[in-house]
C-alpha cells in the first residue's frame, strides 16, 4: 500500500502545487488581529474519508508506518456487540485500512501547514506541525483507550468536550478545535464506533459514481472518508460542543449525488464537508433541527447530561443534533438559511471570496441527483494571490426561488451567536414545523385581531319597507313593567388595555399630546387647563362605532373598571373623566376652554346660532319666526314645490318652506329640556329634600358678642354617601316615561303638492300616503316599546292591525294641540286642515270628531308623559274576541302601563289632592277614542273598496293592514277594552 508520509517542508514552498494533489482544501480565515479570544477562534474539522473498497494494495513507507502504529484504535474488535460474523475481516485488511487513514492524516497535516503558511503572511507567527501532530496523537491515544469498549461514546467517563478543552492547541493566539457533527446513519442496534466493514452500503469508485448511497464509518470518533472515492458520506460525530461555526454533513447522503466526484472539481474546498464546497468555517447543516446548544445522542438512546449520541428516533430534544427524520424544533436546513452567524463560504484571513458551487461534471453526466447549494453573489475583493486582509465584508446569502428552497427551512427558535466574529444578516421567517424534503408553502395570514360588527341602537332598520311582519322581526326580550336595562340593546364585551402593543417608556411626546392619526383619541379633563389627548392602539379601532351611541355612562364605567388603565393613563395628573371625542360637541366645548372649535350654527338657515330655542339650536331670527308662525296660526303656501332653499340670505323668501324646515329640524313650542339636563336637575332637587334640616344655632352671648358655631360633623357613609349614590342611581335609571319620550317617532311629512287643486281625491290620497308613512313609524315604535317584544309575533301583528287607526288619530290630536293650540288639524308640517279643507276632504264630521279630542287635551292640559303612556294603552285597547295567544303576557303588560299612568298622575304638581279625578278623566278620554275610531274605520273601509271608482290611492302598508283587518272587524271579531262601563 502506498501512503503519503508527512515531511517537514519549509514555509516558503509553492503551495499551489499541493492543492492539486488534495481532493479538498481547508481554508482558514483570520480576523487579522494578533490576539484573539475563545469567542473568535476557528474550528478545525478533522474529517478524513475512507471507504473499504478503495484501499490499494501497496507497501507503506516508513513515515506512514509510524502513523499506523499511532492509530491502533482503528482496529475493529471482533467481540463488540452488534457486529455480524460475516463482516469480520482479517487483520491484514485492518492494517491496510489503518495505513490509508495514516495517508489521509498526512494529507490533512499538509493542508493545515498550507493554511498556516497563508496566515503567516500577515502575522509572522506560525505553529509547528509537530504541535498539531502531537495534539492529534493525544486524541488518538484517547480513542485507543476508549475505542474497544462496548458502550457508546456517551458512556465515557470523561466527556470528549473536557478532553478537547485540555488538549486544544493555540494557533496564532487562538484555539483550534476539531469538530465534526453529523447525524449517524448506522444501524440502530450497532454501536457508534464501527468499521467500514460493518456498514450496509458502499461507495463506488470514481469511475462509477452511479451508486451514491455511500455511508462512512467513524473509527473511534474520527469519521474517515477516502479522498479518492469521495461520495457524499455521512459521518458520525464526536459530541463536542462548539462555540464558533459548525460543520455538518448533509443527512440524506444515500439519495444525494456527490459534487466531488473528481478531486480536480474542488476549488479550495474543505476536506470535512464534501457536498458543501465550503471552508472550515462554513456550515453545512443537515435538514434536521440544529440548535445553538446541540449535542449528539446515541442509537441506543443513552443520553448524557451535556453530550450524547443520538439515533434518528431520539431527536425530540431541544438540545440534540438528530437525523432528518424526526425533529420538532425550529431547524436550519441548508447553508442558505443559517442563523448561527456563520459565513456562507470559506474565507482566507479576512477576504470574502464568494463563488457559485456546482457539482462535478462527472456527477452530472452520470445522472446522479444533485445537491442544492446556496447561490452566493460574487464579491469584488476575491482572493487572487493568497495575500489577505482583515475580514470586514458581510456576505449576503440568497436562496433560490425555485424548488431548491425546499431543502432549506428557517429556524423558529434559532438565535444569532454573538460569539462569532462573522455576521450574516439573513432575513428569517419563523415556522413551527420543519419543512425538510418538501416544497415550501407559505402559511396564510390569519387576522388575530378579526372585526366584529356591532348592532346599532336604532329602530329605523327595515328589512321590508312595506311588510308589517318584516319590520317587527323576531321577538327579543324586552320590558316587563319596570323598564330595566341600559341604552345598549346588546352586551358589548370590553377588553382591558394591557398595554402590550407599545412600551410605555418609548412613547414620544408627539404621540402623547395631540391627536395621533393612528387611532381614536380620548380627551382627559385636567382641571381647567384644557385637554390632553392620548392615542389609542390599533386594537381599539374596531370599536370606534361605539362612540356613536348617545348614552356614554355604561361605556365610560366599563373603561374605568380597569385599574391598570386608570393608573397608566393618569401619569400623576388628576384625571377626572374622559369622554370620546365624537360623542357631543357641546360637552367637549364645555370641558375644553382652550379648544378652537367652530361656533354653533343654526340648523334652519345656517346662520350663527344664539342658543337652543324650542329644542333646536337656532338663531334668533328663526326662533322669532317659528314662534310667530305657530302662535299666529298662519297658513303659509309655497309658490314653488315645497323645496325652496333656506339659508341666511334667502330665508325670508318663502315662509312656508322655512316653517317646514323648522318643524323638520324638531322645533316645538312645548319642547322640554334635554334628558341629560333633566337628570342633573333631578339630582339637585332630590339632594336638598333628603338632607336633614340644620340644627338651630346656639344663642348668642350678649356679654362676649360672639357667635358659637357648632363643629361640622364629617359625613359618614350612612348619612351622606348612600343618599347621594341612591339619588344618582335613581336619576341614571331610565323610567318608562323617559324611555317612551326617547322612542317617540319623528315628524313625517305628507308631501302635499300645493300646485294641485284641493279636491277630495287628492286630499284623501295624500292622507293615505301620510298614514302609510306614519304606520311604518308606528310599527318601528312598537318594536322598541318596552314589554311589547315579549309577546308572540302573531300577537304583535294583531294588536297593531286593530289599533293603527286609533294611534293615528290620537297622535293627530296631540300635534294639533301642541302646534296649533287645537285650532287646526295638524296632520303634517306641510298639511294642516282648516275649516275649508275639512269640507273639501269629504270627511268633515270625522275631522270635527278628531278636533274635539284635541280640545279635550287643552281642557285637561295633557302633559307629554301622560300622552306617551296613554298612547301605549291605546295600542293595547283592542283585542280579538277569542283572545291572544299569550293573553297572560298581554294582561301583565297592560296592567304595568296602567300603573305607570297612575304614578304619573300622582306626581303631577297641579293635581295634588285630585289625582284620582284626573286619572278618571284620562281613562274616560281613552274610552271615547273607540267611538271615534269605529266611524273612521267605516269611512276607511268604504274608500278602500271604492278606491278605483273614487280614484283614491292606498299605499302598500295600508293595503296589507286593511286587507287583514277588514274581515275581522266586519265579522265582529274585534273586542274593544273599556276602562268604564257605558
Swiss-Prot record:
Binding site for 21-hydroxyprogesterone: 768, 774, 815, 943
Residues annotated as binding Zn(2+) 2: 638, 644, 654, 657
Any one GO cellular component localisation term in the record: nucleoplasm
Chain residue ranges for the region called Modulating: 1-601
UniProt-annotated binding residues for aldosterone: 768, 774, 815, 943
Localization terms from the record: Cytoplasm; Nucleus
One Pfam short name: zf-C4
Compositional bias per record (Pro residues), positions renumbered to this chain: 690-701
Region (Important for coactivator binding): 780-783
Low complexity biased stretches: 258-299, 345-354
NR LBD domain boundaries: 724-962
Keywords of this entry: Cytoplasm, DNA-binding, Lipid-binding, Metal-binding, Nucleus, Phosphoprotein, Receptor, Steroid-binding, Transcription, Transcription regulation, Zinc, Zinc-finger
Cross-referenced CDD domains: NR_DBD_GR_PR, NR_LBD_MR
Family according to the record: Belongs to the nuclear hormone receptor family. NR3 subfamily.
This protein's domain notes: Composed of three domains: a modulating N-terminal domain, a DNA-binding domain and a C-terminal ligand-binding domain.
Cross-referenced PANTHER family: KNIRPS-RELATED PROTEIN-RELATED
Entry function: Receptor for both mineralocorticoids (MC) such as aldosterone and glucocorticoids (GC) such as corticosterone or cortisol. Binds to mineralocorticoid response elements (MRE) and transactivates target genes. The effect of MC is to increase ion and water transport and thus raise extracellular fluid volume and blood pressure and lower potassium levels.
Designated name of the protein: Mineralocorticoid receptor
Species per Swiss-Prot/TrEMBL record: Saimiri sciureus
High-level lineage: Eukaryota, Metazoa, Chordata, Craniata, Vertebrata
Protein encoded by which gene: NR3C2
